[in-house]
A protein has these predicted regions:
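Hydrophobic helix-and-loop "lid/oligomerization" segment in the mid-to-C-terminal part
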Residues: 22-142, 164, 182, 216-453
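A short acidic, amphipathic alpha-helical/loop segment
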Residues: 156-160, 369, 384-387, 493, ...
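N-terminal amphipathic/basic leader segments beginning at the initiator methionine
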Residues: 2-27
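Active-site cavity-forming subdomains of large catalytic enzyme subunits
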Residues: 135-204, 208-225
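A residue-level signal for conserved active-site and pocket-lining positions in enzyme catalytic cores
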Residues: 42, 146, 302, 498, ...
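Mid-to-C-terminal polyanion-binding domains and interfaces
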Residues: 74, 78-82, 322-371, 405-407, ...
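Flexible glycine-/small-residue-rich
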Residues: 90, 148, 170, 189, ...
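Histidine-centered active-site/metal-ligand motif
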Residues: 173-174, 377, 442, 529
Length: 587
């Protein structure tokens, strides 16, 4: 199959990453009985005290700090009071789906009688509120259109909606471009001059904040008979799932939201659809973690938007019928299995192409890679880009035809620390107007579209920008470790405590340890994974370890230096520990 990629190189970094231990930070005062290990891990992440490590909902930033939120509340109050038709338009990823569900559920809780929802189809409409989607939505006759998790880059779509006489409220969290859409109101913490301290609020978090502000206004106006209004914390299960799945930084504000949502899910108080999804994924709701959201719930919801239609995922999050929820969850399970197969095939193609390029470059790796295959699926290119970014430790953009045989390509970009990928695309766009049709995103991930006949020019322009913006030192991958665990800490009690701590995620990473071990035995599983039996002085018997995707044809030496996560081996009933290996180096 044809493959195209950028192959310009700077000074190559070694294939072997460098493991560096975090600087020690003295923890503050913790309650008696707190594991010293946990206090040390929190402190190393800038959370020296329980208040910083485990923020409560009472510490959330105030909604009024968001630019435009008072005007947004005014639009919604007027719409509810006058029984206007409110249309919530979501996005086809997990953040967009949960944001849509939060918007619909929350507005109905607050008294809106005519709330509808819609979501673009990735294959039909492309990203966000497009003019073609607006044309289809006209049959719903909305008075007020509310975008969630998108809209800041949808100038043409918002213009089309306004031309039909609709009011438009944009709620988004993506970085704005040089020209804002002509919406009536925009709420986005990343607007220039916005005073909201958390710039990492997810799309689902933004609409949740709008609802909180709306309830406060209605409460102050005496709308609610009980003087309080509905309990919006019942929506935090959805907020938690969307926030974690979107890989936004878990700053204290987001950790407060996610922690509260996880408590609801663990208590069995999540919405019917999420409870069904947890069951279908084989997870234990009582022990659910942010990692489970990121690796089990999020991918299953995202699979609908990648291969089918996210309307299915939103239906799951809105239904109150347990039987329907189970049926949809099983359908999502099947779609996710198909997604995994498609992703594996595309990843194999990409790895083969990159291997050829590295050979052609005498063992050097490209400074950035642009991958394209005419047979790839546009809904999966982001996963391939992420996988190749991890494999190369380079910025990667993967492209696929917008639809089979199309001349327009859809690309998904993933970056490494040191290169703001959206800013890089903005610089390409500024220097080569018309080369990119559309783009948007964040520091570490972005999306774009361009014409097939522009891909070679784009590759050259992108590589030139990367060479200019990226410090060569950033090409040397550094793995931050939380240090070595003592022999008595390699225990299921510590593994269980780490699992239920956190929540861990972007910007507040799950603990990663390192240590030197003797390899007692090893074998390869499913031709991809490396299973190890290890010995360590002071630990009786052997320690089980698994390096997923770690088999590349080279046997490990007798002694290894591992970067690993400590976990319980659920397959063995949870009593034995298992090391989840991230990096296996000669030791």
């Amino acid at each position: 199959m044809p493959m195209s990629l950028a192959a310009d190189a700077v000074q190559p970094s070694p294939d072997t990453p460098t493991i560096r231990r975090r600087d020690a930070v003295a923890p503050g005062s913790w309650p008696e009985g707190t594991l010293p290990l946990l206090a040390r891990l929190y402190a190393a992440r800038g959370a020296e005290t329980p208040e910083l490590a485990l923020p409560k909902l009472g510490s959330l930033h105030a909604p009024e700090l968001l630019t435009g939120i008072d005007a947004a509340v005014g639009l919604l109050v007027e719409a509810i009071a006058n029984d206007k038709r409110i249309l919530v338009v979501g996005d086809f990823d997990c953040d967009g789906a949960t944001a849509c569900a939060v918007g619909v559920r929350g507005l109905r809780m607050l008294g809106a009688q005519h709330v509808f929802h819609a979501v673009p189809n990735r294959m039909v409409h492309g990203y966000g509120l497009s003019p073609s989607l607006v044309e289809e939505l006209a049959e719903l006759r909305p008075d007020l259109l509310v975008t969630v998790d998108h809209g800041i880059a949808c100038h043409a779509g918002v213009t089309a909606a306004k031309a039909r006489g609709w009011q438009v409220l944009v709620t988004d969290h993506h970085l704005p471009g040089p020209q804002l859409p002509p919406a009536d109101v925009i709420v986005d913490p990343n607007l220039d001059g916005d005073a909201f301290p958390s710039k990492s609020l997810a799309g689902v978090g933004v609409i949740f904040y709008v609802l909180m502000a709306l309830r406060r206004q209605m409460r102050d106006a005496g709308v609610f008979a009980d003087g309080k209004g509905p309990d919006l914390t019942t929506l935090l299960d959805l907020v938690a799932v969307g926030t974690v799945a979107d890989l936004v930084a878990l700053d204290p504000n987001n950790r407060a939201l996610v922690s509260a949502g996880l408590r609801r899910l663990r208590a069995g108080q999540g919405c019917v659809g999420l409870r069904a999804l947890i069951e279908a994924s084989g997870r234990d709701a009582a022990r659910l973690t942010a990692t489970d959201i990121g690796f089990a719930l999020g991918p299953r919801l995202n699979a609908a938007g990648r291969l089918e239609d996210m309307a299915l995922g939103i239906a799951l999050l809105l239904t109150e019928d347990p039987r329907q929820a189970r049926d949809i969850a099983q359908t999502l399970e099947q779609i996710n299995s198909e997604r995994r197969a498609v992703q594996q095939s595309m990843t194999d193609d990409a790895e083969q192409a990159l291997t050829r390029v590295v050979l052609d470059m005498a063992g050097q790796r490209p400074v950035a890679a642009c991958l394209f295959d005419a047979d790839w699926h546009p809904g999966v290119v982001g996963l391939v880009a992420s996988k190749m970014k991890d494999r190369l430790h380079r910025p990667v953009i993967a492209f696929a035809p917008a639809e089979p045989g199309a001349d327009t390509l859809r690309g998904s970009a993933r970056s490494i620390p040191g290169l703001h990928i959206r800013d890089a695309l903005a610089l390409v766009d500024a220097r080569h107007p018309g080369l990119i049709e559309r783009f948007g995103g964040h520091a570490m991930a972005a999306g774009l579209s361009l014409r097939l006949d522009h891909i070679d020019d784009f590759k050259a322009a992108f590589v030139a920008v990367v060479l200019e913006m990226l410090d060569p030192a950033a090409l040397q991958q550094q793995v931050l470790s939380d240090g070595e665990l003592a022999a008595d800490e390699l225990d299921h009690r510590y593994a269980d405590a780490l699992r239920l701590a956190g929540p861990w995620g972007q910007g507040f990473p799950e603990p990663l340890f390192d240590g030197h071990f003797e390899v007692a035995n090893w074998r390869v599983l499913k031709e991809r994974h490396l299973k190890l039996e290890l010995r360590l002085p002071g630990v009786p018997g052997t320690i089980n370890a698994i390096h997923f995707g770690g088999w590349h044809g080279n046997a490990p030496g007798r002694h290894v230096h591992l970067a690993y996560r400590l976990a319980c081996d659920d397959y063995r009933g949870g009593s034995a520990i298992q090391l989840i290996v991230e990096h296996c180096l000669p030791g």
